[in-house]
Regions:
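Hydrophobic anchor at the beta1->P-loop junction of P-loop NTPases
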Residues: 17
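N-terminal pre-Walker A segment at the start of P-loop NTPase domains
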Residues: 1-6, 126-130
């Protein structure tokens, strides 16, 4: 008999499993399917806080309609994970999703931190028991030691306005890609410039493969991917709020995936709520000038430097 064991913890609504064939990705989904069909009397033991289901094929919509507060596994080869219709449908649910895929899924807002490969370790004696665990594929920043001449942000909201003001003080340029899916083409078009890319790690997962390839082949790019600009402000300590400090330590304990499909949305709501009616009153579209006062600005930039060194 061969024993296989998979052990992992899900932190967010969307977890992506990548990797070549024969790394055990499909075996994991097969085991969940077997348990779904045979239950406790079957060969698979499942130890989990939530029910687990496999959704597949053309009837995915109907299957999803019947699943609540569960973990949904989707194996590679299910083309529906690419379509906007699927992205819309899952954002109306309170489930967690584990999707096996080889390519980036541009319709889905998944975090760079929740893209995993499966590592196999340990064969125990004659039992041939192998233990599988997840490992993170992407870093949340790259530490190439370059002095950028330009900062590129993914959109033109408050984050861009903040970095644009900082750049102006340092005779640097700040540009926006007008959407995360344009970051790659912007970098290709500006191949000779030293650029620091700042994007929301909480939803940059689909772009990471191709952008990281550019970073690795060129000496003049550096990536900085905080959860979001709002997370950066909250982490900088300027609010001096103990509840915020607790939330930042283990966000997954506080964020209800049903209300906030992406952590970036949660941190925006938290910052907006915590600063309402104060001099730091935050809105996503237009940066409050209070964030450009020296002490506030330096606290935010200081948090960035901390993140780069960790």
């Amino acid at each position: 008999t061969k024993y296989l064991k998979y052990e992992f913890e899900l932190r967010r609504n969307l977890t992506i499993i990548r990797g070549d064939s024969a790394t055990g990705k499909t075996t994991l989904v097969d085991m969940i399917r077997t348990h779904m069909n045979d239950g406790e009397s079957g060969p698979v033991t499942l130890n989990c806080d939530k029910s687990c289901y496999v959704v597949e094929g053309n009837l995915w919509k109907g299957q999803l309609d019947n699943i609540q507060d569960s973990i949904v596994f989707i194996d590679e080869g299910n083309e529906f994970v690419r379509i906007k219709d699927f992205a819309r449908a899952i954002q109306q649910t309170d489930n967690y999703y584990v999707i096996v895929t080889r390519e980036g899924l541009s319709a889905l807002p998944y975090s760079v931190e929740e893209v995993y490969g499966i590592r196999t370790s340990g064969k125990y004696g004659s039992l041939k028991q192998s233990y599988h665990s997840f490992y993170r594929i992407y870093p949340d920043s790259t530490t190439e030691n370059i002095k950028p001449e330009k900062i590129l942000t993914e959109d033109s909201n408050s984050g861009y306005q903040f970095f644009d003001a900082v750049c102006a003080e340092h005779q640097m340029q700040c540009d926006t890609a007008n959407g995360k899916s344009n970051v790659f083409s912007y970098l290709k078009a500006h191949r000779d410039e030293k650029i620091m890319v700042i994007a929301d790690g909480a939803a940059f997962g689909p772009e990471m493969d191709r952008v990281l390839q550019l970073v690795h082949t060129r000496e003049n790019l550096v990536l900085y991917l905080p959860e979001s600009f709002e997370w950066l402000i909250l982490s900088s300590g300027i609010l001096k709020d103990t509840e915020v400090a607790q939330i930042l330590q283990t966000p997954s304990d506080y964020i209800d995936g049903k209300d906030y499909f992406s952590w970036e949305r949660y941190f925006t709501a938290l910052l907006t709520e915590k600063t309402a009616g104060t001099y730091l009153n935050y809105t996503k579209k237009t940066l409050n000038k209070a964030y450009l006062s020296d002490s506030t600005k330096n606290a935010i930039l200081g948090q960035m430097m901390k993140g780069k060194q960790e």
